[in-house]
């Protein structure tokens, strides 16, 4: 019996070249994690909220996907889409680059703004998209943020912005830098009106965005492991000629030094934002206490010094957490003092 044509002929290794080798896996089926280098199925990553199932690394999330994760279905209303682009420095190739990214991403710029509901809480939402020139802040990005915040002030709505950026957009020069002051001024007016602004920092948040709207939130949250800073660690290391502390400019480092109020897992982000927004909604008290006075006085002067010490050391003495549980329905701890402390 002859088996000449029964088995598929294989090519020897020595005859393989870069041109003849073709991927055996269909394009778009697998995604490589930049941290653990594992190849994971794209669908598995999607089902896990774009978190690596092997090492927990957070993949970057596109703006519309973020909206789907955070906003109640069907509630997002986009604002200020299609604002005209400018090229103030007449930078060569800038217009063509913008047009190419618009076609590739389906976005008009590096941020998506609009109104949404988060578990029924009306909110103005802004989401940066790193695919669009690393979400750098140019005139259109600054204008969209400013318009969204000003409208939120008029309609007395809270603002939530998911920041992700490489900083100011160098192709627009001083016009880009002006957006830092412009967005900050709008947020100051929003704050003066007594309204809430929550900033959520994702990987990476750097440059002029860090120096403006990203770090101006009443409450500042971050995703685990996010790089947050003005200049990047490589630039700082080369400038000062010294080794940087372990974890420098990571979200955990900033939380430890008082610049963040909390680090929130992506799977818990919507629930956390919903809880914070609900706490800041104006609501009438569910009930007013009508009972008798429950406090009673004990004269400590009747006790000896040692008896007072024993009372202070009593293991059954209520702690701060005990009082919080008794007095409030919900409590969310905020860490940041913005002074390099807690």
Q: What residue spans do the PLM features occupy?
A:
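Terminal peptide-recognition signature
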Residues: 52, 125, 164, 214, ...
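Cleft-lining beta-strand/loop regions that shape enzyme active-site pockets
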Residues: 112-191, 198, 338
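Conserved catalytic cores of soluble enzyme domains
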Residues: 165-285
């Amino acid at each position: 019996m002859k088996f000449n044509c029964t088995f598929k002929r294989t090519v020897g290794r020595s005859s393989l070249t870069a041109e003849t080798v073709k991927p055996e896996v269909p394009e778009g089926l697998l995604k490589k994690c930049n941290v653990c280098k594992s190849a994971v199925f794209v669908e598995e990553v999607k089902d896990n909220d774009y978190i690596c199932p092997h090492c927990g690394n957070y993949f970057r999330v596109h703006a519309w996907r973020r909206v789907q994760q955070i906003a109640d279905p069907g509630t997002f209303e986009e604002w200020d889409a299609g604002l005209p682009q400018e090229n103030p420095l007449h930078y060569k190739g800038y217009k063509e680059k913008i047009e190419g990214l618009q076609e590739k991403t389906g976005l008009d710029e590096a941020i998506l703004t609009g109104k949404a509901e988060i578990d029924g809480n009306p909110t103005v939402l802004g989401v940066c998209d790193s695919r669009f020139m690393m979400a750098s802040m140019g005139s259109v990005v600054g204008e969209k943020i400013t318009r969204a915040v000003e409208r939120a002030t008029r309609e007395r709505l809270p603002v939530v912005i998911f920041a992700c950026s490489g900083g100011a957009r160098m192709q627009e020069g001083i016009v880009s830098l002006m957006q830092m002051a412009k967005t900050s001024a709008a947020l100051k007016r929003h704050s003066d009106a007594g309204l809430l602004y929550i900033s959520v920092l994702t990987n990476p948040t750097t440059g002029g965005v860090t120096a403006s709207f990203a770090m101006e939130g009443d409450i500042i949250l971050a995703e685990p492991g996010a790089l947050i800073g003005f200049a990047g660690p490589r630039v700082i290391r080369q400038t000062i000629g010294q080794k940087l502390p372990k974890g420098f400019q990571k979200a955990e480092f900033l939380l430890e030094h008082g610049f963040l109020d909390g680090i929130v897992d992506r799977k818990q982000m919507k629930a956390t934002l919903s809880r914070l927004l609900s706490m800041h909604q104006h609501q009438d008290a569910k009930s007013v206490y009508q009972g008798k006075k429950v406090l009673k006085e004990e004269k400590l002067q009747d006790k000896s010094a040692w008896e007072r010490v024993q009372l202070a050391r009593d293991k059954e003495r209520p702690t701060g957490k005990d009082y919080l549980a008794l007095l409030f329905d919900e409590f969310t701890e905020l860490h940041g003092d913005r002074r390099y402390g807690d």
